[in-house]
Amino acid sequence: MRFERCAIATTTATLASLALAAGASAHGTLNLYGKNAFANKTGTLTLTIPHGCGPDGLSTTKIVMQLSSAWQAAKPNAVAGWKSSVKRAANGQRTLTWLATGSGLPNAEVGDFPITVRWPKKAGTYNTPTAQYCGTQLMDWKDPFNAAADGDLPYPANYPVPRVRVHAAATRAPSAVTGSFPISICPLHGASGSTQ
């Protein structure tokens, strides 16, 4: 049973990795690099920008990400060639901004922008609307995910909003055992009193 659970978990993680790799070729993505997000814990969330803007492939010069008030803390990690800032509005929403200090991220290069965060207190799926600027051109990653195409939105979305799943906080076994102990009712083998 333990082996089956391990095999299922490994297969699921592998498929998720393949899905992320496929998505990274076209859209702004969020990566956790093998570490799940747990409610009310700290972790690292990485925004990946896989290309520039428009048919001319302009370099990315500015990135702006919005985090709702559910997020408890967020601080961009240092990225060479970029300066970052965080502004918190009165309603608790955070705006993370990265500005290129040079020519920006070329169209042919992939850029990672890691953020140290304290995950929201409640488990759930959280959107992180993100705007990618290439000079005056904008790629606005904020389209909602819908089950199928409808009159207002195509499927899949042209500019899907990056989002992350936050799991319920993991419970740990107590460090010291107290109280009553279970009694084994398994038959004993061998001589009387043996506990093989």
Kindly label every feature range from the protein language model:
Residues 68-95, 162-168:
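A surface/secretory-pathway sequence property marking extracellular, secreted
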Residues 22-26:
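Sec/Tat signal peptide C-region and signal peptidase I cleavage site
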Residues 10-19:
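Bacterial N-terminal signal peptides
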Residues 40-46, 111-112, 125-128:
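Short, solvent-exposed loop/turn segments enriched in Ser/Thr/Gly
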Residues 27-33, 39, 135-196:
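Extracytoplasmic/periplasmic copper-protein system
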